[in-house]
From Swiss-Prot:
InterPro entries reported in the protein's UniProt record: Brix, Brix_dom_Rbsml_bgen_prot
PROSITE patterns, per database record: BRIX
Domain of life according to the entry: Archaea
Single Gene Ontology MF annotation: rRNA binding
UniProt xrefs under HAMAP family: BriX
Keywords: Ribosome biogenesis
Record domain Brix: where: 1-196
Function: Probably involved in the biogenesis of the ribosome.
Source organism of the structure: Thermococcus kodakarensis (strain ATCC BAA-918 / JCM 12380 / KOD1) (Pyrococcus kodakaraensis (strain KOD1))
Protein name (database record): Probable Brix domain-containing ribosomal biogenesis protein
Amino acid sequence: MMLITTSHRPTRRTRSFGHDLEKVFPNSLYLTRGKKTIQDLLMEAYDRGYERLLIINVWKGNPLKMTFIKVDPEDWGYIGYLYLHGIKLQREIGFRNIPPIREEMPFVVTTAKRVGIDHTAFAQVFAELTGGKFVPRGNKSLQTIADKNNTDVIGVIENYPRGMAVNFYRFDITRERPVGPLILVKIWIMEDGRRWDYKEALGIKPKE
């Protein structure tokens, strides 16, 4: 699915976030960046058969931005970006030592029930960014969606007061609650011009 790495000299928390993402994106890998350039990373992702490269950028010790890049030697390019309020790691939610998914299965993206059109739009965008599959929620349970799509993992777009949240379910671990990580998104931007900003959505005017 994707190769996951960070900007140069990441903090421990950012590395932990990368490892957590490796455990919820099927058949993906977290790789220590070292001195590798973006071109080096793209070649490594291509050699390993991945369709996406995800780079986690750091600010003041915490993950600030997630950059998604399409892996294709003839048509590689930036797809889009998520700007974050913050994250909660799996261990902070109560889960440790979750194994990665080392087999091919769909990464399904849906929404919580009773959310707005902005959440549905972001669910579709998140599926594009990750190479996943968007499935409308309707009245279906998450377990029903997982069963119909032959997967153990679902990313769910949820309400959050200052933006939107992405949470992750691993049904091979527990069917009762999400395992994380929890990603709190304040802005998303796609290279084709689509974008969303929580301040604009809430009508908050910038300070002059």
